[in-house]
Regions:
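N-terminal secretory signal peptides that target proteins for export/translocation
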Residues: 1-18
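Bacterial N-terminal signal peptides
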Residues: 19-34
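N-terminal leader/targeting segments and the immediate start of mature chains
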Residues: 31-75, 86, 215-229
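Non-transmembrane domains of secretory- and envelope-associated proteins
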Residues: 41-42, 148, 160-170, 177-229
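Short, hydrophobic/aromatic-rich segments at coil-to-beta transitions
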Residues: 60-66, 84-90, 149-157, 179-186
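Beta-turn initiation residues at beta-strand->coil junctions
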Residues: 69-71, 92-93, 108-109, 186-189
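An acidic-aromatic
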Residues: 78-127, 195
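Flexible, surface-exposed loop/linker segments and immediately adjacent secondary-structure boundaries
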Residues: 119-150
């Protein structure tokens, strides 16, 4: 039986990951780019559908992203991820995550564990901080917010009764107005916590193979294996 875990983005541990299994909707890999009508949005040249589709095309070809995670009460943490269709690799201080399309693998150096699981869509979203950039459905109310010059900010609020983002009150995505590239993702939780991902660089990821989304035995040979499959 899995123990109860507290919600803690800043720890970036297996405890954090498993707590979020049922908390977040799998926006990363389900449905199409069916965008709900924008409520209260002024007429603008920025095309949200186009921006999301542009990011989707990058992911299909393979993309590498560097970012900084900030949350209340903790120091900023640098991280990077690369995405290739359904597969992804995520690296944060003390933690490495890999998904090869079927098995989710997590190396947690602070807890000295190597965890394997067959993930649900919620699991994948929980482990992929950039899932929120992609594929919101008609179950969201989307509004354009005031934003600094040169950027566009959209707020995504789950429709009442949908319960699509349990634990998350709403989230916001900031785009560069000229390039239409995502620049920042802010998550606002029901309990008042805010977690932000500031994207520094997005570039094509070359030389991706099936081995890019798994770990070599020497990387986890000294760790306790936790197989949840």
């Amino acid at each position: 039986m899995r123990p109860n875990h507290s919600l803690s983005y800043q720890r970036y541990s297996v405890r954090f990951a498993t707590h979020l299994l049922g908390s977040l909707l799998a926006l990363f890999l389900c449905g199409t780019f069916a965008i709900a009508p924008l409520h209260g949005q002024r007429k603008a040249v920025f095309d949200l559908n186009k921006a999301l589709q542009q990011f989707e095309q990058q992911v299909k070809k393979g993309v590498a992203i560097t970012f900084t995670l900030t949350s209340q009460g903790s120091k900023p943490q640098e991280g990077y991820t690369w995405l290739y269709g359904r597969r992804f690799m995520l690296s944060m201080p003390g933690m490495e995550v890999a998904f090869d399309g079927s098995t989710l693998r997590i190396i947690n150096q602070s807890e000295r564990t190597y965890t394997l699981m067959t993930p649900s869509e919620q699991d994948l979203t929980a482990m992929n901080p950039l899932a929120y950039i992609q594929k919101p459905s008609q179950r969201f109310r989307i509004t354009e917010r005031k934003s600094p010059r040169g950027t566009v900010v959209y707020r995504f609020v789950p429709m009442q009764g949908t319960n699509v983002l349990a634990g998350v009150k709403y989230y916001e995505v900031t785009f560069d107005q000229q390039s239409q590239a995502p620049k920042r993702v802010d998550l606002y939780f029901d309990l008042g916590e805010q977690v932000s991902y500031t994207i520094h660089k997005i570039q094509p990821k070359e030389h991706i193979t099936s081995q890019s989304f798994t770990f070599a035995p020497q990387e986890y040979k000294s760790l306790e294996v936790v197989d949840l499959r």
